[in-house]
Amino acid sequence: METIPKLMAAVVLLTVCLEGCSSQHWSYGLRPGGKRNTEHLVDSFQEMGKEEDQMAEPQNFECTVHWPRSPLRDLRGALERLIEEEAGQKKM
């Protein structure tokens, strides 16, 4: 009976270790693949601060895609008007 809990604990521990070892390395500044160089550590933090300043500025986005008018939208509008007319006639 004692071997099963030990075996389960070993499997869980092995899984956690393998997951941690196979994960991707992220360097300073959250950019993948870079080397950690202590000489340039201050530069990377300053760059992160500049990126935050740029993110703080509001950005205006415009939709450049023009979708053709959908026939289903026209049908929906016609059905809504028909329902409103019928409801108006029933009230009278």
UniProtKB/Swiss-Prot annotation:
GO biological process: what's one of them? regulation of signaling
Q: What is the reported tissue distribution? A: Central nervous system.
Identify the GO cellular component terms for this protein. Answer: axon terminus; cytoplasmic side of rough endoplasmic reticulum membrane; dendrite; extracellular space; Golgi-associated vesicle; neurosecretory vesicle; perikaryon
What molecular functions are annotated in GO for this chain?
A: gonadotropin hormone-releasing hormone activity; gonadotropin-releasing hormone receptor binding
Q: Which residues carry this modification: Glycine amide?
A: G33
Signal peptide residues are: 1-23
Which InterPro entries would you find in this protein's record? Answer: GnRH (IPR002012), Gonadoliberin (IPR019792), Gonadoliberin_I_precursor (IPR004079)
Q: Which PROSITE patterns match?
A: GNRH (PS00473)
**Which Pfam family, just one, is annotated for this protein?**
GnRH
Could you tell me the superkingdom of the organism this chain comes from?
A: Eukaryota
Site for Appears to be essential for biological activity, residues: W26
Its primary localisation, in coarse terms, equals: secreted
Q: Which residues carry this modification: Pyrrolidone carboxylic acid?
A: Q24
Secreted keyword on record: yes
Query: Where does the entry annotate site (Cleavage)?
Result: W26, S27, Y28, G29, L30, R31, G33, G34
Instruction: State the compartments where it is located.
Output: Secreted
Ordered alphabetically, the record's keywords are: Amidation, Cleavage on pair of basic residues, Hormone, Pyrrolidone carboxylic acid, Secreted, Signal
Family membership noted in the UniProt record:
Belongs to the GnRH family.
In UniProt terms, what function does this protein have? Answer: Stimulates the secretion of gonadotropins; it stimulates the secretion of both luteinizing and follicle-stimulating hormones.
Full protein name: Progonadoliberin-1
What is the taxonomic lineage of the source species? Answer: Eukaryota, Metazoa, Chordata, Craniata, Vertebrata
Encoding gene (name): Gnrh1
